[in-house]
């Protein structure tokens, strides 16, 4: 008899507030959408798991979590990543899941990242436009993590969708890649921006994100935009806090495809 289960696999974070506001809402939405099925969470970062363990907080990898579900009698599992784009982290996660596929005789299914296609990008743009109403002479710098390769185009697709909807007050930046903070600052100055809000284009605003975006040092994004004459603040809410983001992840879990 087939028994289904579902796993939500995010990078994880050491910031307690971020786990509550950015990861928990997505996990709860998935658990509600698949009510009645065994549900578990996994953190893909070994570094995060190790440091949480030192605090007495238990967490498991995707492989460990899938193995546990199989041991409990789950024969068909859905693994929904909390990733934003199909970059290196996606490849590693897919490989980790693939290694457990034989444990699920009725199939192991893998959901897509948040920004997998144009529909996702448009829905993400709608969620951002609703969450951040426009203000006179004010811009919003959406800062993604950045990846190697073509996956970064997904970040640009969100901003393009915002611009197509008339929200030209949104600009894109990447922590690892281009445009970087200085390039974003120059663009905002050219556009006549007097003030700006930096908003993470990541599931969670973890400790390193907070340092790089909102830190007091001269190298942080907030400091660099302020140095360019733009009065800048930074919101530390990750994408996981937006209901529209949970909706995309739930849809992707429902559309998950079998690993072959």
Model-derived regions: residue spans:
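Extended amphipathic ligand-handling, pore-lining, and cofactor/metal-binding catalytic surfaces
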Residues: 1-260
């Amino acid at each position: 008899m087939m028994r289904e289960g579902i796993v939500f696999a995010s990078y994880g974070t050491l910031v307690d507030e971020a786990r509550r506001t950015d990861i928990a809402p997505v996990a709860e939405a998935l658990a509600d959408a698949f009510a009645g099925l065994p549900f578990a969470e996994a953190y893909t970062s070994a570094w995060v798991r190790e440091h949480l363990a030192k605090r007495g907080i238990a967490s498991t990898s995707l492989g460990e979590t899938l193995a546990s579900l199989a041991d409990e009698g789950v024969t068909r599992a859905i693994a929904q990543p909390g990733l934003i784009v199909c970059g290196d982290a996606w490849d590693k996660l897919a490989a980790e899941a693939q290694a457990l596929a034989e444990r699920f005789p009725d199939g192991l299914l893998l959901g897509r990242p948040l920004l997998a296609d144009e529909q996702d990008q448009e829905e993400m743009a709608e969620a951002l436009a609703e969450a951040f109403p426009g203000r006179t002479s004010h811009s919003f710098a959406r800062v993604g993590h950045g990846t190697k390769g073509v996956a970064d185009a997904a970040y640009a697709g969100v901003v393009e969708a915002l611009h197509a909807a008339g929200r030209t007050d949104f600009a894109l930046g990447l922590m690892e890649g281009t445009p970087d903070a200085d390039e974003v600052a120059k663009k905002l100055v050219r556009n006549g921006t007097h003030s700006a809000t930096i908003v993470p284009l990541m599931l969670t605003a973890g400790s390193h994100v907070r340092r790089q975006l909102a830190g007091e040092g001269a190298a942080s994004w907030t400091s660099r935009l302020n140095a360019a004459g733009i009065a800048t603040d930074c919101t530390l809410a990750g994408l996981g806090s937006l209901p529209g983001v949970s909706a995309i992840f739930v849809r992707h879990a429902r559309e998950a495809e079998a690993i072959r």
